[in-house]
């Protein structure tokens, strides 16, 4: 690792329709087997279904869902003296967004429904309303961090 200069953060290009980086991050996480056009179709279908179901701007709903799902702290297993502790760590903004996107997509994939676009749309709506599997996962993570707060000095 060079001490000369820090590496630049990789930034994703905004998507063509909404001109938003968050949407392109979501598309890149939905992506399976290199089928980016299918990932675009899934996400835009989810956005249109959220617009149809709520009557609001889907970008606002996506942002609300991301805010509600993004964790502040996570627990990380750390081995000290032969025993493993769950050490709570604060999460940076980029890592928090990545975790929120991952949790939203896994929750929508596990959801029962017809197609991925509708499942993702319903998960976004639920997350914006502060319920749903992804929000529950964030709350569980925060509870774990709170329970293991005594081990915070092991950072």
Swiss-Prot record:
Top-rank taxon, per record: Eukaryota
Q: Name one GO cellular component term.
A: plastid
Keyword match Ribonucleoprotein:
yes
> SUPFAM superfamilies from the entry?
Ribosomal protein S7
**Keyword annotations:** Plastid, Ribonucleoprotein, Ribosomal protein, RNA-binding, rRNA-binding
**An annotated GO BP:** translation
Q: Name one GO molecular function term.
A: structural constituent of ribosome
Q: What broad class describes the main subcellular location of this protein?
A: plastid
Enumerate the CDD domains for this protein: uS7_Chloroplast
Compartments (UniProt record)? Plastid
PANTHER family, alphabetized: RIBOSOMAL PROTEIN S7
Which family is this protein grouped under? Belongs to the universal ribosomal protein uS7 family.
Give the multimer and partner information. Answer: Part of the 30S ribosomal subunit.
Q: What does this protein do?
A: One of the primary rRNA binding proteins, it binds directly to 16S rRNA where it nucleates assembly of the head domain of the 30S subunit.
Q: State the protein's name.
A: Small ribosomal subunit protein uS7c
